[in-house]
Amino acid sequence: MKRTKSIHHASFRKSWSARHLTPVALAVTAVFMLAGCEKSDETVSLYQNADDCSAANPGKSAECTTAYNNALKEAERTAPKYATREDCVAEFGEGQCQQAPAQAGLAPENQAQAQQSSGSFWMPLMAGYMMGRLMGGGAGFAQQPLFSSKNPASPAYGKYTDAAGKNYGAAQPGRTMTVPKTAMAPKPATTTTVTRGGFGESVAKQSTMQRSAAGTSTRSMGG
């Protein structure tokens, strides 16, 4: 009889443990679900300039202008920089490059090198910008400059890309799309000049990574 009692006690302990671990497992699941929500994508709109934004958002002209001007400043800080106009044009096409402000993020030694060779350094024009809500649920808007190449030989040809080379599809303003929240985070300042074709290589690598990630996600969802 004592043995039977011992067996019953063991069974009871197992049953008790199972019942009391279940809420813990549920709590862990809830934490992961919340973490997933925090990393969720957000909807952004793509505009060429402040006028496009204002036309699509009546009554938000001031916000559109502020976002556009902030995107221009961000473009000066983070856009790829080239030592010569020719290098920039080879990447982005004729009429798509401008002289970059001397204070736009480039390290002093690189500024001196570029200025010695051509009198200045060069960057692509901002082709458009993404606009979305501020991270953290603020009342204002976040923005991210976009660039595009007019050179058919470039991987960035006809596409909107950010300063890191990530591709956001066709360079057509007025679109709305869903992007990761990290897409709207500030990019690091450009501190070195890019060699000819270097930005295009970054775009090609980013596109390959995006396709690979999309394929992995599809396979995971399909089991």
UniProtKB/Swiss-Prot annotation:
Pfam families assigned: DUF1190
Biased composition (Low complexity): 178-195
Chain intervals for the UniProt region annotation (Disordered): 178-223
InterPro entries: Biofilm_formation_YgiB
Segments of skewed composition (Polar residues): 204-223
Superkingdom, natural source: Bacteria
Similarity remark: Belongs to the UPF0441 family.
Protein name: UPF0441 protein YgiB
